[in-house]
């Protein structure tokens, strides 16, 4: 048997140690952000996906180069479409 000493009990519940307080706050914030991410992930990632797809600004670029860039982007999209399975719902 190992003798028990007084003062070895866990004091996590009533601890005022700054490290414990900071860890608790970070844990709670992480949990809140994770829940929000799971609830709104479709909206968030759709906005990020289409918000970043606008491409670079075309100010000062000749129209012929703009058209060439559009064609390159479209051909890249056409190539990528072959990797996906299209499911049509009736």
Swiss-Prot record:
InterPro entries cross-referenced by the UniProt entry: Flu_M2
Residues where lipid is bound covalently (S-palmitoyl cysteine): 43
Gene3D superfamilies: 6.10.250.1640
Primary site of residence: virion
Subcellular location per the Swiss-Prot or TrEMBL entry: Virion membrane; Host apical cell membrane
Record topological domains on the Virion surface side: 1-15
Molecular function GO labels: channel activity; proton transmembrane transporter activity
UniProt site (Essential for channel activity, seems to be protonated during channel activation, and may play a role in the channel gating and selectivity): 30
Bilayer-crossing regions: 16-36
Membrane topology, from the record: Single-pass type III membrane protein
Residue numbers bearing the Phosphoserine modification: 57
Protein activity control: The M2 protein from most influenza A strains is inhibited by amantadine and rimantadine, resulting in viral uncoating incapacity. Emergence of amantadine-resistant variants is usually rapid.
Listed GO CC annotations: host cell plasma membrane; membrane; virion membrane
Residue span of region Disordered: 53-76
UniProt entry keywords in alphabetical sequence: Disulfide bond, Host cell membrane, Host membrane, Hydrogen ion transport, Ion channel, Ion transport, Lipoprotein, Membrane, Palmitate, Phosphoprotein, Signal-anchor, Transmembrane, Transmembrane helix, Transport, Viral ion channel, Virion
Membrane-side (Intravirion) residue stretches: 37-90
Top-level division of the source organism's lineage: Viruses
Pfam families named in the record: Flu_M2 (PF00599)
Family to which the UniProt record says this protein belongs: Belongs to the influenza viruses matrix protein M2 family.
Self-association and partners: Homotetramer; composed of two disulfide-linked dimers held together by non-covalent interactions. May interact with matrix protein 1.
Domain notes: Cytoplasmic tail plays an important role in virion assembly and morphogenesis.
Protein name stated in the entry: Matrix protein 2
Provenance organism: Influenza A virus (strain A/Guinea fowl/Hong Kong/38/2002 H5N1 genotype X0)
């Amino acid at each position: 048997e190992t003798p028990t000493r007084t003062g070895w009990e866990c004091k996590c519940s009533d601890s005022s140690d700054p490290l414990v307080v900071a860890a608790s706050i970070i844990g709670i914030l992480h949990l809140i952000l994770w829940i929000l991410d799971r609830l709104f992930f479709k909206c968030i990632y759709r906005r990020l996906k289409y918000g970043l797809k606008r491409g670079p600004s075309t100010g000062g670029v000749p129209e012929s180069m703009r058209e060439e860039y559009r064609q390159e982007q479209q051909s890249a999209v056409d190539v990528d479409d072959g990797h996906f399975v299209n499911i049509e719902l009736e």
